[in-house]
């Protein structure tokens, strides 16, 4: 969401929604690799602000037939309509993915969207805090009890016949 245009995302994923008869979700991430941002004229230090602003626009593009919008990170829109429109007027379900950012958990809760905690290398307690924040804010924003909050979890594993082989093969990376 940080290095892509929300208008392009709105139109591309509404089209995909039509092609697959609504059987899709969209998972958005902020990105955590600094060198990628300049390829798109962005600065990783603006990552949170870009994620918040770009998603606010994407959310509006899918819900308003005509959008007048101005922000800090893209050109303004005046009387703009994203096409195609979401299938049956229902935008795709969105997951906000995060490795470490409480702001993204807050954003997911605010909109009533899913929160995907992608555990790459942080301790479990870190993700417990992120998910706890999301659940608390989910309730705060009136979406229901904390246990009804929509949480997804991810992780990585590198497996070999024995742990030493796995360590030796993966260590260079």
Where are these regions (language model features)?
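N-terminal glycine-rich cofactor-binding segment that shapes the pocket for flavin-like pterin cofactors
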Residues: 1-173
């Amino acid at each position: 969401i940080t290095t892509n245009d929300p208008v392009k995302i709105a139109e591309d994923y509404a089209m995909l929604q039509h092609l697959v008869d609504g059987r899709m979700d969209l998972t958005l991430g902020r990105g955590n690799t600094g060198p990628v941002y300049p390829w798109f004229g962005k600065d990783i230090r603006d990552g949170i602000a870009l994620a918040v602003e770009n998603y606010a626009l994407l959310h509006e593009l899918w819900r308003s037939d005509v959008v007048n919008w101005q922000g800090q990170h893209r050109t303004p829109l005046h009387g703009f309509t994203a096409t195609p429109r979401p299938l049956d007027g229902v935008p795709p379900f969105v997951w906000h993915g995060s490795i470490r950012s409480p702001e993204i958990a807050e954003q997911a809760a605010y909109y009533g969207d899913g929160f995907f905690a992608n555990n790459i290398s942080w301790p479990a307690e870190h993700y417990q805090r992120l998910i706890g924040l999301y659940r608390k804010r989910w309730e705060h924003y009136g979406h229901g009890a904390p246990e009804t909050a929509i949480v997804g979890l991810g992780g990585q594993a590198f497996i070999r016949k024995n742990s030493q082989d796995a360590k030796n093969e993966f260590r260079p990376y």
